[in-house]
Swiss-Prot record:
HAMAP family: Maf. Keywords: Cytoplasm, Hydrolase, Nucleotide metabolism. GO terms for cellular component: cytoplasm. Belongs to the Maf family. YhdE subfamily. It catalyses: dTTP + H2O = dTMP + diphosphate + H(+); UTP + H2O = UMP + diphosphate + H(+). Its cofactor is a divalent metal cation. It comes from Anaeromyxobacter sp. (strain Fw109-5). One of its GO terms (molecular function) is dTTP diphosphatase activity. GO terms for biological process: nucleotide metabolic process. Coiled coil: none annotated. The record marks R13, T67, Q154 as: Important for substrate specificity. It is found in: Cytoplasm. This is dTTP/UTP pyrophosphatase.
């Protein structure tokens, strides 16, 4: 039996990515503290926050995620303000960095015990060198202000990305392949699992 999926996020990017999967869902944003604990490793941080988001929302099947940009061990979340966004972009300029997303699927059928399935996905991103004028212009667009690491690969910020190694959807905010696998393991069928779904192989009849 498939449960109605609840997305514990207000991110429009995650909603759009779930729509790409063809997975019906409703949105119930989680209100959790996303601060990094002192000395907390980046992988532990994104996984902890994803789990806390999943636990903060009611539902029989809840999906939550948290994304962070990591540069030389520093976790870059969403910038506090425009000045913080400029600082992040200047630090990322001309470097390679890591994007981590923690994903948690929490299933709690009826009054039964909850089961959590989770994963952390890593993508390497190479950034172009950016001058002060480019950074100021980009920050003035407003795009960086609600994005981890102060850029959006699916937006104007994609012009600054020289290369990506790994999942691109992970950089946007939700790694699709890994999320699909977690949903399947939680007992939630995917559109192509259903009888009469897309044919396997893709060959001509």
């Amino acid at each position: 039996m498939a449960f109605r999926l609840v997305l514990a996020s207000q991110s429009p990017r995650r909603r759009e990515l779930l729509d790409q999967l063809g997975v019906a869902h409703e949105v119930r944003p989680a209100n959790t503290d996303e601060s990094v604990h002192p000395g907390e490793p980046a992988r532990a941080y994104v996984l902890r926050v994803a789990r806390e988001k999943a636990r903060a929302v009611e539902g029989e099947l809840v999906l939550a995620a948290d994304t962070a940009v990591v540069l030389r061990g520093e976790v870059l979340g969403k910038p506090r303000d425009a000045e913080d966004a400029r600082r992040m972009l200047a630090a990322l300029s001309g470097t390679a960095h890591e994007v981590l997303t923690g994903v948690c699927v929490r299933r709690r059928p009826g009054r039964g015990s909850a089961v959590e399935l989770d994963a952390v996905v890593s993508t390497a991103v190479r950034f172009a060198p950016l001058g002060p004028a480019e950074i100021s212009w980009y920050v003035a667009t407003g795009e960086p202000l609600d994005k981890a690491g102060a850029y959006a690969i699916q937006g104007v910020g994609g012009a600054f990305v020289l290369g990506v190694e790994g999942s691109v959807s992970n950089v946007v905010g939700l790694p699709l392949a890994e999320t699909a696998e977690l949903l399947r393991r939680a007992g939630h069928p995917l559109p192509w699992d259903a009888p009469g779904g897309p044919a396997q192989g893709g060959g001509a009849p």
